[in-house]
Amino acid sequence: TCAELVGNHSLGIEERGSANILVADGNVPLGESTCISCGNCVQVCPTGALIDRRSMYQGRETDLTHTNSICMDCSVGCYRVVKTRDNRLVRIDGDMDATFADGLLCEMGRYNPVKENRVRVNEPLIRREGKLQPISWDDALNVVSTQLKAHDSTEIKAYISGRQSIENLSTFQNFFKDNYKVGQTALFGHDESAAVSIELAREFGAFESDLGALEEADAAVILGADLVDDYPVAGFMLKRKPGELFNMVLVTKEENKLADNFSNRLVSVGENYEQIINLLACHKTAGSCEETDQIIAEEGLAARRAYRLLESVQTWQHPVIIVGKDFAKLENLETLKKLIRYSQEVGAKVIIMKGDTNSFAASLLGLEVNPEMGESPVAFYAIGDGHACHHAVDGMKNGGFKIVQTSYMDEFAELADVILPSKIWAEEEGHYLTTDGRIELNRQALIPGVQQRSVSEVLAGLAEKSGFSLQSDWQAVVTDKISSIVLA
């Protein structure tokens, strides 16, 4: 599993015959090895030599409730089985019967939810005389409704986490944009990749491939994407390729561990995306060109290495181009168009990795990306079980009245004037749109506390107090929009 499926090569066999033993990196303690804690070896181990200590002694497999669901810790959309007992999260396993990703999970999807140790918000809170105090749901909604009505709607801002379901994103947009006409409805964070893919679709239509292209590829050009840290299971699909046969062109902002797996590689640390695209374009047919020579002169030894490697482009049978958040920016749109035209000329498949779990759906619904977190008299923050974004926290410090719907007490909650308790991922059902266009269902696995509510439930309550009803048909909105990939 470690080598053949994950491509990490941490585990191996030492000694022979009856003395052979499973070891990590030449027999060092597992915690000191190159193990990435994905847990896939633990799940498939047939003997029990490797076990999950967090779920030990919490019951037999038949004592647990199994809920087939989807991972929402990135936009890849791996399938997983959430295992619970007595309304407690016991363990998360990969769905070995799934057709995508061989049932693999990474540390984020398997262990991070189980390790969650933040303090839950269990009741609505309001800040009075500098201190947070309990308040009833009805009173909390009255306070929020009064604040929204007391100000010019165009000055109000509303932000939401990309971890929210499509249902919650759609209701959020319907409430704040369609009904309240607020000045800004946006996702947290700086990632523009989903919005970029939609802009490119206006000219090129459904130009993207699904993640299955990674399995078929014999060469990859990766521009501004970190598959190891941000999308580990997608990284597994490349890491397990034979390093001496697979061709890798890797252009990143910072050092990238994926390069260590391949000998036939060009690694450029920096944002030389346009130069690399020009090199590729020059080599779509055999031979050289003046532009290539000019780039080589400008870039020096690294570019000469690129020149030698890119001469092999003609031998690539199934190349894939992977674009990430460091390159997929609206300011790079024209360069990206040049890349798409090149890919169509040479038959290369293109995948744009799309930020947070549901940022693709959010962009299709019309939510803004990379917002300016400036001052506003009232701001609504639908965070859910997401983590505090420093950019957003800094923006909150300059704001007016702050309404925060969150599952946990964190930096957002410390700045809030009203805190509304939110359900976590396992406590509500909802749909998610993956980076390659699959609409998947996250099934409820836990029963929430009596005070926890979803974003949609909170906004429905506010709509009732404001005298209007919410009408949100997310299926029609998402599927009718021009998309960079055919939605499934």
Regions found by a protein language model. Name each.
Residues 189-487:
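Non-catalytic alpha/beta scaffold blocks inside enzyme catalytic domains
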Residues 1-294, 464, 468:
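N-terminal export/assembly segments and adjacent metallocofactor-ligating motifs
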